[in-house]
Amino acid sequence: MVILGIDPGLARVGYGLIEVNNQRQVKMLDCGIIKTNKNQYEGERMVEIAKDLRVLIRKWKPGLAAVEKFFFYKSSTTISVVQARGVLIMTLARFKVPIVEFPPMQIKLAVAGSGHAKKDEVLEAVMRELRLKVPPRPDDAADALAIALTGLFQQ
């Protein structure tokens, strides 16, 4: 089964795709970011996110999507990120991709063994689990792989 991990954002959406076989062996298929143009109107940026996510869904046909659950912080970008997350959830639902959601502490706990793990500890755990020699970049893509692994581990 293919699992798509998503780290929501407006400027950059991290994505990570992993595949697990019947023997529960896991490998990375792809990872990267959906980047939007900060000079565009928010609505146009949302359209770009949905369009690029559709391309990923059609190419990889994920059987599950794992999405980081957003918590409110006092920030001017909060509303925009929540809206972008809504676009992501809607697009996944339109393609009938089952969705699971995890808060950051649960992702850290599932992947690195501690809900308070530091970013580099999570990255090391992702690299170990996926047998990667080079760290996935950018950070949003690495985070998305951790989210995808959490989707696998929580099944």
Swiss-Prot record:
Gene3D superfamilies: Ribonuclease H-like superfamily/Ribonuclease H. Its EC number is 3.1.21.10. It catalyses: Endonucleolytic cleavage at a junction such as a reciprocal single-stranded crossover between two homologous DNA duplexes (Holliday junction). Keywords: Cytoplasm, DNA damage, DNA recombination, DNA repair, DNA-binding, Endonuclease, Hydrolase, Magnesium, Metal-binding, Nuclease. The keyword Ribosomal protein does not apply. InterPro entries: RNaseH-like_sf, RNaseH_sf, X-over_junc_endoDNase_Mg_BS, X-over_junc_endoDNase_RuvC. Mg(2+) 2 binds at E68. It is found in: Cytoplasm. Binds 2 Mg(2+) ion per subunit. GO terms for biological process: DNA recombination; DNA repair. The active site is at D7, E68, D140. GO terms for cellular component: cytoplasm; Holliday junction resolvase complex. Its cofactor is Mg(2+). One of its GO terms (molecular function) is magnesium ion binding. Mg(2+) 1 binds at D7, D140. PANTHER family: CROSSOVER JUNCTION ENDODEOXYRIBONUCLEASE RUVC. The RuvA-RuvB-RuvC complex processes Holliday junction (HJ) DNA during genetic recombination and DNA repair. Endonuclease that resolves HJ intermediates. Cleaves cruciform DNA by making single-stranded nicks across the HJ at symmetrical positions within the homologous arms, yielding a 5'-phosphate and a 3'-hydroxyl group; requires a central core of homology in the junction. The consensus cleavage sequence is 5'-(A/T)TT(C/G)-3'. Cleavage occurs on the 3'-side of the TT dinucleotide at the point of strand exchange. Belongs to the RuvC family. Homodimer which binds Holliday junction (HJ) DNA. The HJ becomes 2-fold symmetrical on binding to RuvC with unstacked arms; it has a different conformation from HJ DNA in complex with RuvA. In the full resolvosome a probable DNA-RuvA(4)-RuvB(12)-RuvC(2) complex forms which resolves the HJ. This is Crossover junction endodeoxyribonuclease RuvC. It comes from Prochlorococcus marinus (strain SARG / CCMP1375 / SS120).
